[in-house]
């Protein structure tokens, strides 16, 4: 900065320079908007300088078709599964309904002929599979993933702990009777590519050996043609329109049908649950503080009643209900080996047109209202929320 300028002039010049440089925190390309630093071949993803994740794909279990006793047993096993996660492990459950190219499915179900007498049987079976495909889920592929992550100072420190957690989780899935598979780096990139290219059916072509030869990064092989945010509640990802919403849970309890109804929608969408276990001591301390505040409010209401000449035992029903619920929760935490979890429930609806998108968002909102909850669309936070669905177990909002 020239020394002959006054302090006010120097400040003015610096303001112009900063404006020209732009905000370094704003993504300048589609690649910059993909929220991770590096993907390793073994499936470990470095999201930030000190945060690392892995992803497991898991299959369905016949919960809805099971008898009541079996459903109770499955639910108890699932509770034990969730209690495995301590406060140092963040995890994300992702449920994806994505439209796929019908021609690829037809190739998968086509049974090649062989030099024997069973070709007529193969033809009949292939025809039956194609007929079922045509009557199926509108070409939707429905998959489920669990992504878990930890904080560590380096890859060397993170890797052994992630492997240990992975082994425990795979054993927990096995006890539930659920088939599960760890995704390697290429499979995670393929999955993210499919998420970014929902509407164009662009094929994923990638090999690790291409990186040093081309000078490209893995993000160049998965990024869409671009991201755009034309309106405060809508974003564009390539040729697809999308909208992010969060579930506002206002019901006293949630039915296990809520998630099923979301996933039964016949449209491409991603439902994500970001879950963080709260440290047991902090959870108990927080509940005790809440009970103390409720008791203080109760005393204030009783004082008002006495001054007004009313019965002091008559207090607002909300106070009585909240106090009862808080004490029940404290008992569960202290004596029943329960954990407290923080949950963010996100829904990404999509559509090939804005009108189709709005129709799908309306349907999802109707499902939420059916269970006395609200689906709230985020104003001016579509990009941050969209990043939170990318299987990195890092909630950005």
PLM segments and residue spans:
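Positively charged, low-complexity/disordered segments
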Residues: 391-397
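Extended, folded cores of ATP/NTP-driven motor/assembly subunits in large transport
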Residues: 1-390
């Amino acid at each position: 900065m020239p020394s002959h300028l006054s302090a006010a002039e120097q400040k003015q010049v610096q303001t112009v320079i900063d404006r020209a440089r732009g905000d370094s925190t704003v993504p300048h390309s589609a690649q910059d908007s993909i929220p991770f630093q590096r993907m390793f071949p073994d499936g470990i993803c470095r999201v930030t300088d000190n945060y690392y994740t892995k992803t497991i794909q898991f299959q369905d279990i016949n919960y809805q078709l099971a008898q009541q006793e079996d459903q109770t047993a499955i639910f108890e096993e699932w509770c034990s599964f969730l209690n495995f996660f301590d406060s140092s492990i963040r995890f994300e459950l992702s449920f994806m309904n994505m439209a796929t190219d019908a021609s690829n499915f037809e190739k998968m179900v086509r049974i090649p002929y062989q030099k024997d007498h069973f070709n007529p049987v193969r033809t009949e079976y292939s025809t039956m599979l194609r007929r079922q495909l045509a009557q199926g889920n509108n070409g939707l592929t429905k998959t489920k993933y669990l992504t878990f992550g930890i904080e560590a100072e380096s890859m060397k420190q993170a890797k052994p702990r992630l492997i240990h957690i992975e082994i425990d989780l795979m054993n927990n899935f096995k006890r539930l009777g659920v088939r599960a598979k760890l995704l390697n780096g290429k499979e995670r990139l393929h999955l993210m590519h499919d998420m970014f290219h929902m509407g164009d059916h662009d094929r994923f072509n990638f090999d690790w050996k291409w990186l040093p030869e081309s000078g490209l990064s893995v993000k160049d092989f998965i990024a869409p043609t671009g991201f755009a945010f034309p309106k405060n509640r809508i974003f564009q990802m390539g040729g697809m329109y999308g909208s992010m919403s969060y579930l506002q849970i206002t019901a006293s309890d949630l039915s296990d049908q809520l998630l099923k109804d979301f996933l039964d929608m016949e449209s491409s969408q991603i439902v994500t649950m970001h879950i963080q276990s709260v440290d047991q001591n902090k959870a108990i301390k927080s509940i005790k503080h809440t009970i103390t505040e409720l008791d203080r409010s109760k005393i204030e209401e009783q004082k008002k009643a006495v001054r007004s000449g009313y019965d002091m035992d008559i207090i607002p029903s909300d106070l009585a209900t909240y106090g009862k619920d808080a004490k029940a929760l404290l008992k569960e935490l202290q004596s029943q080996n329960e954990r407290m979890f923080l949950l963010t429930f996100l829904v990404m609806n999509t559509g090939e047109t804005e009108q189709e998108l709005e129709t799908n968002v309306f349907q999802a909102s109707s499902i939420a209202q059916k269970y006395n909850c609200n689906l709230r669309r985020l104003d001016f936070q579509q990009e941050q929320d969209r990043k939170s669905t990318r299987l990195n177990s890092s909630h950005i909002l």
